[in-house]
Structure formats: structure tokens, C-alpha cells
Amino acid sequence: GRDAYIAQPENCVYECAKNSYCNDLCTKNGAKSGYCQWLGRWGNACYCIDLPDKVPIRIEGKCHF
């Protein structure tokens, strides 16, 4: 797994306010844990710890929402 911003299918981050929301989202996707990274590169977004390689992550380029 890797530590990364989990992405929606369109390469968009999951915006957040609470750590609990991100922890639920990340663990449902197989990560060890997750939290809401405030004021990060893509604003307030969910960041997952040890997320499985099969789960998409935010990469360079635009978010096509």
C-alpha cells in the first residue's frame, strides 16, 4: 500500500472537514487509516495511510468533475 490522497474516478480528491469521515472512507477502501489534510496541495482533502495499490489516488493533472 501507499500513503496518498484517495481519488474519485475523475481524479478529484474527496473534500472533507472531519478526520472521522476520511478515516471511514479510507478504511472502507482497505487502508490502515485516514485523516483530513487541511490546507494541503488540493485544499482540505482525505489522505489515506497504507492504501492498497488498486485504489485510485490523486495524480498530476486536472480533476475532471
UniProtKB/Swiss-Prot annotation:
Residues 2-64 form the LCN-type CS-alpha/beta domain. CDD domains: neurotoxins_LC_scorpion. One of its GO terms (molecular function) is sodium channel inhibitor activity. One of its GO terms (cellular component) is extracellular region. The modification Phenylalanine amide is found at residue 65. The keyword Thylakoid does not apply. Expressed by the venom gland. It holds the Pfam family Toxin_3. Keywords: Amidation, Disulfide bond, Ion channel impairing toxin, Neurotoxin, Secreted, Toxin, Voltage-gated sodium channel impairing toxin. It comes from the Eukaryota. Disulfide bonds join 12-63, 16-36, 22-46, 26-48. It is found in: Secreted. GO terms for biological process: defense response. Has the structural arrangement of an alpha-helix connected to antiparallel beta-sheets by disulfide bonds (CS-alpha/beta). Belongs to the long (4 C-C) scorpion toxin superfamily. Sodium channel inhibitor family. Alpha subfamily. Binds to sodium channels (Nav) and inhibits the inactivation of the activated channels, thereby blocking neuronal transmission. This is Neurotoxin Bot2. It comes from Buthus occitanus tunetanus (Common European scorpion).
